[in-house]
Each structure stands twice: as C-alpha cells, then as structure tokens.
Amino acid sequence: MYQKSALELRNAVVSGESSATAIAKYFYNRIKTEDNQIGAFLSLCEERAYEKAAIIDAKVARGEPLGKLAGVPIGIKDNIHIRGLRTTCASKMLENYIAPFDATVVERIEAEDGVILGKLNMDEFAMGSTTQYSAFHPTKNPWGLSCVPGGSSGGSAAAVSARFCPIALGSDTGGSIRQPAAFCGVVGFKPSYGAVSRYGLVAFGSSLDQIGPLTTVVEDVALAMDVFAGKDDRDATSQKFFTGSFQEALSLDVPSLIGVPMGFLDGLRDDVKENFFASLSILERQGSRIVEVDLNILDHAVSVYYIVASAEAATNLARFDGIRYGYRSPEAHSIEDIYTISRVQGFGKEVMRRILLGNYVLSTERQNVYYKKGSAIRAKIIQAFQKAYEKCDVIAMPVCSCPAFADGEILDPTSLYLQDIYTVAMNLAYLPAIAVPSGFSREGLPLGFQVIGQKGKDQQVCQVGYSFQEHSGIKNLYPKGCNKLVDGEVK
C-alpha cells in the first residue's frame, strides 16, 4: 500500500477495494514502526483521524458521493493550525499553544474527505534549511540518516519520502518546500503568491510565505491543488487564478520555450550541473527549445531575501512576548523580565539571530541603507523575470547547488543561507515553482530539477514537471535501504 499515490488510494476507497479506516491504520503502523529513526512527526491525532475515516467509510456504505481526497492520509506542517491541536512551530515559545481554529487549507482537506494524521516537524518558526533547528528533535533524511532532510519543511519531505503519508503540507518562504523535496527525492510545489490561502498559517515573512504540497508524484500535486487553490475572504492576499482543473491541465501540451539563466549556474557542483543539463535534454527531446535568459541580478537575491524576510519576521514575531502569546519564563518578575527573559528562553538561536537582523535593518539609522534598498532591488528582480518571460514560457533551474549534506557539515549561518540561492528569488517575485526528482548525485543522494512559471500560471509549471517526470521515468522514488516495514509487516 505504501507504493500507492494519493490518487490511487482515493480510488481504492471509492471502489471499495480498501476502507479509509484500514488505510489510516496502515499508515499509523508505518509511522509508529519507523518514525523513531527519522523524526518526521511532532504529534499524531489518531482519534480525529479514525473518526474522519469512519465517516468516510459510512458514506461509502450508503453510496454517497465522496470528496476529492477521500481516505487520503495527509500530514500537516506544524505552523498550520488544526483546531484543538498544538501548533508549536517547533518552538519552545509555542510548546503548549492550542490552535483555536482550523486553517483554510485544513478546512478544505476535511471538506474533501482527507484524513489528517498529525503535525510534522520543521525548523523553528520555519527559519532554516536543515530541520535541525527544531526545539524538540531533528529530522533525518530517509535516503541517508546521517544527512539533513532540508528545511524548513523537512518533516513534511521526510514523511512523504518514507511513505508515512502520500501528501504533506509545507510552507515556502524562500525554498522551504522545494529544497527539502529535492533532498528527500519527492515533488514539492510552491504556488504563486496568493494562490492558496494563508489563513491559519503562522506568519514568518508575510510577503513571501506560501502553503503548498509535497508528494511522491506530480499527479498528486495536481490533486492537492484542485482542493487547496482558490480565493479566501479571510486572507486579503488570496486570489482566484485558475478556472480549470490542475489534473486536467497535466494532459495539455507542454510549453515550447524553456529559459535557462546560464550565467547563474557557476556555483553548481560538477555532478549537479551534469544532472541539470541532462534534465534539460529530456525536455528538448519532447520538442521544447532551450533559450538563454539574463537573470544575473539574482546574484543579489539571497542578500535581498534575508533583509526582507528578517524584517518581516521581526515584525511578525513581536507578538510572541510572554504576554500576548507564548512562553512566559517563571524567572520573570517584572514586565521587562517577561519580555526579555521569556523571549531569550523561548526562542532558539537562529530565530533570535533573524529577529536581531530584522530589527537592525528596520532601525531608523539603517532603514534607508538596507531595507529600502533591498526592497528596490526586489522590484528589479521582479522586472528581470518579466523581461525573461518575454523570451520563454517557463524557466528551469537547479533546486540546490549540492545534494543533502551531513548533519553538522555546514555550521556557519552565512553558508547555510547561501544554500537558498536557487530558490529565494521565486518568493521575492511571487512566482510558482515546482521541484521534481531528477536523478542522483555521485553519493547516491536525490537531486531535483526546478521549473518556474509566471505568476498565476501554476498549471503550466505542473505540466512541465509532469512531462519531465513521465519522460525521464524518475518518479515515486523510495529509499528502501532505511525502511524495514513493507506492506504492514516488519521485515
């Protein structure tokens, strides 16, 4: 059963081949047997899941119509609210916070008969690219337990890779869906800004954040987006971009012109560069034409991103002060102590580093030098993409300059920030992007291929990703070496 896609599991429930309860039980068995070595989940919601599964099975028995996600097990990143469950953001600051409402994406999942299994680990407040910054435990990469799974949605990527669920929700502020997807050999999709409601997502960078799915195959991205996408009046930034179905769009003709920023590929490791150009050749053989585009301004994207993201994070996280929200230190005996001691004890080092950076670039003395200048360069990045799209339909890039690295191999914060060089620009420019598995590094670790589209043309991005998947034959990758559980039995 672990080899089935979300769409195949849904069809099994609809046909009566399997029940939603049996599917939920099977995947909980996998999680309880295997997740102790991976650490993908922070919490499970078995009672809620089995209640939902029983409702679905009763619908089947009565012959009632079923939702698009009927019986599909889904994991939720722990910065997305599920009413009555903890939303910790993998932080001591919110360790005991119980969400009072459901996020819009959670409402839409359950309205379409999806079965939510639990909350997934992440870098604290989504700040990081390793999922080693969780306050509770690190997550390991199913392809190599000594390697990081990427981040900040590392728990989501690891859960899908290890087949704990066929769909997981993540959030992407600067690559936090796509980079872990590439590291763990799964598909990760960042929709256009505003395509999926952010209501119920704990904000990191409000002009950058976007919720999206991680799956084993592109077809399941399309299935998920047909549920998640759409305007939501509770999120002022949400828009209605799409009229047709994502699933139907996969069968349409693939765009013919693919732009490649050749001048932006110098930092790639040799085997990663070779894999990228081999991936382009697969699309060329299907009739696409490669054209060079000028995106050299993206050399500044990481600097701009960390100015903008840190400024927005400092503002968004100001509410977590031990008074309005979050951990209050028992050592605090005055208002000043509550603010200072609670935040020092409640936040991890990386979160504090970014809050300090954000407050610095927003300070009166430095705002013009950093924040306003960074915002101006962001506008030029958007213009550069617009000009590039005059020559092509979509743009292709690697996801990362290297495969997953060992835990502790990169400790310098600046070096870790540079890991985002091929992903942050899409968030700065509000663009949709998909990461699909494209093969393996010389160490045998997964690599990813990234397709970026114009804002609102998410379906076109998925078309190209699907075409690449089908013609490369690289799909449904499974790290057999790290799992003992096969078909419900421990081997």
Curated annotation (Swiss-Prot):
Name any Gene Ontology BP term: translation
Enzyme class of the recorded protein, top EC level: ligase
Q: Which PROSITE patterns match?
A: AMIDASES
**MF terms per GO, please?**
ATP binding; glutaminyl-tRNA synthase (glutamine-hydrolyzing) activity
Q: Name one Pfam family in it.
A: Amidase
Highest taxon above the source species: Bacteria
What keywords is this UniProt entry annotated with? ATP-binding, Ligase, Nucleotide-binding, Protein biosynthesis
> What do the Gene Ontology cellular component annotations say?
glutamyl-tRNA(Gln) amidotransferase complex
Enzyme nomenclature, EC number: 6.3.5.7
Residues of the active site are 77 (charge relay system), 152 (charge relay system), 176 (acyl-ester intermediate)
Which InterPro entries does the record cross-reference, listed alphabetically?
Amidase, Amidase_CS, Amidase_dom, AS_sf, GatA
Q: Does the keyword Protein transport apply?
A: no
Alphabetized NCBIfam families for the sequence? gatA (TIGR00132)
Family classification: Belongs to the amidase family. GatA subfamily.
Q: Cite the record's note on assembly.
A: Heterotrimer of A, B and C subunits.
Which protein, by its recorded name, is this?
Answer: Glutamyl-tRNA(Gln) amidotransferase subunit A
**Provenance organism:** Chlamydia abortus (strain DSM 27085 / S26/3)
